[in-house]
């Protein structure tokens, strides 16, 4: 296809009367439109009706679902509460009784007696029934009798209350003492380990026997402290801490433990009054049904039925997925063909992103650069305009003269315009008629929209009543106008005449004030933005006072700069130097740099508080004055005047190269902006993956 030119011809053959056929076609289109409108109107009514029915059904379904959900949640809550408060407690107690019976080898009398003692001990101590029963089983396992077990547990509970043990710590000390009891010997290792729990075995034996501690330690080292010494230690420890647990029961933890034990007994009584047995009977029925169904094969049939339903569901999902893929595959293939033969979708997406990025960057860059461009272009545009004015004046081009010493009366009479008075001016027209007109408030009084001017008409006119409602009228066509030397260039927009008509000093002052106002607005906006961002960040929250001072400088200075044409303090600092004709450009620039440095230094120093503001302003002023030469050009730009800043020309280029071969394929995309220095190239070397 490369190098060939393709041509396609489209031929429209109109047979018969074109106008008649056009009317027929128009009538058919109108009929089709009316029919379509009727059909769509009817369809809309049906859609609205069906939508209303769906809404009603949805409301009913939602209400029903809420009722079912509330009922299900209620049932679940009742079941959970019953299981947690009653059934679970009864099941745990049942398990404890079974364990106790097993411990006594089926002797239910001894088991019940020990269970009764454990219940009472749990009410009188902070261990709880589970802790007491665990300790009973452990003590019996180490070979203690029932009486020794009771005395040992009581001694251990009193020692725990005296030393402030919790249940795990008490169980650790208990294990070490029971190992010593089972070994029937007190070793040095036992004594050292028990010291960590606050129990001095050697000292307890020395106090009980009246023997020196060193002698007891030597006996322990030699392994001569047997069962008699162990029982003496237990008895001594019990006497040392006797009653400590009873005193602990008067504390908050003790009363709470006692209340918990009483509540547990109440829950077990409620469960054992009938509900627990009923639930157990229902569970037995379920288990019996399971056994019968398993034996008869019914359980296997039920499992097969459920498995087949799951299998059918899985197959349906698979078929649906395959059918969906069958419909999606053509679209996928079409996109793949486009990606391979016409344009890479990845490259196309990158091109779109690059174009969007270039657009945003150009807009953002112009928004930032426009104020700087206006300031920078002022001296050049002013010089160019003055040069054009001088050139036109030398060439003697014709134009409307503006004499330096000529009154408006003389000027207007010279071109054939004289003053007349009108008394029948329309009412309400710009406040010239008696009806007045819309006025604009200015300086505390209402000013008319149009200024009062003499009504001037060309040619000799008789005077009317002396009620001046003056406006300006030009002479009629045909009246000759004398050509005069070229005047100063008149502006295309209002407002520039007042500046150009003044002296060079007036132009300098006006431009300086205007540029200070623009700079004030920009500086105020920047400070305000910095203050707002710092106030919302983590640093802003830490240095709240500094951020507040920065925000004050931004907002307050912004308002003052925009309304007064520059900061008051800045104007007071700059005025003596800028208005001094003998001051050099470098000195003026130094004054500007000193003021700007004071502003910025004070803003940064405000992060450290009021003293930081003063110090920062002072240092910034000194640094800015030394950098005055750097801002010389900035001062010269501020002194220029222009109401019409020339819009910056931005040269942007967007190119798309298409290579024709076996198919159409996008090879590159380039966006270049010469004015702002922005170059975005969508090629292999700039964007990864191209």
From Swiss-Prot:
Disruption phenotype: No tail is synthesized.
Keywords: Host cytoplasm, Late protein, Viral release from host cell, Viral tail assembly
Main subcellular localisation: host cell
Keyword hit for Secreted: no
Induction, per UniProt: Expressed in the late phase of the viral replicative cycle. Expression of late genes is activated by the viral late transcription activator C.
Location relative to the cell: Host cytoplasm
A GO biological-process term: viral tail assembly
GO CC, alphabetical: host cell cytoplasm
Keyword Protein biosynthesis: no
Signal peptide coordinates: none
Chain's role: Serves as a base for tail tube protein polymerization and acts as a template for tail length determination. Might remain in the tube and be ejected from the tail prior to the DNA during DNA ejection (Potential).
Family, as annotated: Belongs to the Mulikevirus tape measure protein family.
Name of the protein in its database record: Probable tape measure protein
Organism (species): Escherichia phage Mu
């Amino acid at each position: 296809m490369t190098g060939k030119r393709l041509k396609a011809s489209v031929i429209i053959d109109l047979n018969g009367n074109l106008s008649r056929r056009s009317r027929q076609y128009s009538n058919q289109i109108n009929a089709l439109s009316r029919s379509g409108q009727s059909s769509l109107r009817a369809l809309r009514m049906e859609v609205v009706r069906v939508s209303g029915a769906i809404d009603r059904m949805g409301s009913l379904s939602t209400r029903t679902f809420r009722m079912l959900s509330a009922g299900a949640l209620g049932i679940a809550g009742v079941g959970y509460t019953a299981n947690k408060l009653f059934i679970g407690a009864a099941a745990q107690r049942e398990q404890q009784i079974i364990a106790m019976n097993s411990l006594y080898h089926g002797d239910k009398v001894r088991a019940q007696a020990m269970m009764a003692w454990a219940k009472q001990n749990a009410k009188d101590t902070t261990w709880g029934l589970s802790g007491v029963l665990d300790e009973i089983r452990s003590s019996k396992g180490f070979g203690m009798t029932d009486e020794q077990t009771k005395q040992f547990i009581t001694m251990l509970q009193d020692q725990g209350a005296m030393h402030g043990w919790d249940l795990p710590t008490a169980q650790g000390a208990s294990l070490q003492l029971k190992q010593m009891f089972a070994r029937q010997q007190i070793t040095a290792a036992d004594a050292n380990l028990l010291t960590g729990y606050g129990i001095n075995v050697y000292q307890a034996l020395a106090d009980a026997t009246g023997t020196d501690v060193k002698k007891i330690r030597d006996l322990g080292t030699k392994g001569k402290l047997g069962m008699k010494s162990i029982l003496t230690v237990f008895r001594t420890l019990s006497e040392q801490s006797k009653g400590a647990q009873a005193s602990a029961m008067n504390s908050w933890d003790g009363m709470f433990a006692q209340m918990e034990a009483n509540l547990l007994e109440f829950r077990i009584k409620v469960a054992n009054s009938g509900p627990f047995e009923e639930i157990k009977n229902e569970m037995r029925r379920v288990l019996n049904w399971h056994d019968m169904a398993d034996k008869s094969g019914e359980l296997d049939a039920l499992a097969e039925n459920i498995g087949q339903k799951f299998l059918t569901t899985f197959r349906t999902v698979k078929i649906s997925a395959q059918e969906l893929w069958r419909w999606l595959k053509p679209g996928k293939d079409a996109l793949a063909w486009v990606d391979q033969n016409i344009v890479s979708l990845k490259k196309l997406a990158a091109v779109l992103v690059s174009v969007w990025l270039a657009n945003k960057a150009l807009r953002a860059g112009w928004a930032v650069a426009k104020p700087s461009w206006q300031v920078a272009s002022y001296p050049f545009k002013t010089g160019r305009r003055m040069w054009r004015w001088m050139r036109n004046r030398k060439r003697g081009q014709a134009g409307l003269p503006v004499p330096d010493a000529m009154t408006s009366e003389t000027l207007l009479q010279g071109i054939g315009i004289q003053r007349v008075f009108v008394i029948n001016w329309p009412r309400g027209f710009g406040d010239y008629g008696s009806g007045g007109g819309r006025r604009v408030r200015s300086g505390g009084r209402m000013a008319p929209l149009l200024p009062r001017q003499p009504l001037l008409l060309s040619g000799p006119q008789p005077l009317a009543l002396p009620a001046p409602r003056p406006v300006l009228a030009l002479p009629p066509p045909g009246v000759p106008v004398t050509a005069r030397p070229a005047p100063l260039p008149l502006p295309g927009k209002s407002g520039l005449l007042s500046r150009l008509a003044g002296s060079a000093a007036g132009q300098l002052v006006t431009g300086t004030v205007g540029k200070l106002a623009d700079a004030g607005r920009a500086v105020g906006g920047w400070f305000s933005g910095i203050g707002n961002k710092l106030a919302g960040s983590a640093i802003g929250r830490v240095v709240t006072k500094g951020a507040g001072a920065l925000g004050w400088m931004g907002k307050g200075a912004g308002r003052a700069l925009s309304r007064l044409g520059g900061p008051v303090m800045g104007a007071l600092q700059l005025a003596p130097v800028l208005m001094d004709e003998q001051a050099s450009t470098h000195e003026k620039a130094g004054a500007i740099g000193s003021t700007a440095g004071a502003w910025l230094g004070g803003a940064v120093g405000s992060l450290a508080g009021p003293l930081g503001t003063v110090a920062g302003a002072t240092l910034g002023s000194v640094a800015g004055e030394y950098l005055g030469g750097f801002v010389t050009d900035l001062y010269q730009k501020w002194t220029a005047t222009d109401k019409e800043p020339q819009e910056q020309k931005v040269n942007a280029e967007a190119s798309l190269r298409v290579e024709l071969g076996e198919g159409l394929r996008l090879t590159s995309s380039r966006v270049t902006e010469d004015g702002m220095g922005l170059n975005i190239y969508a090629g292999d070397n700039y964007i990864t993956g191209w």
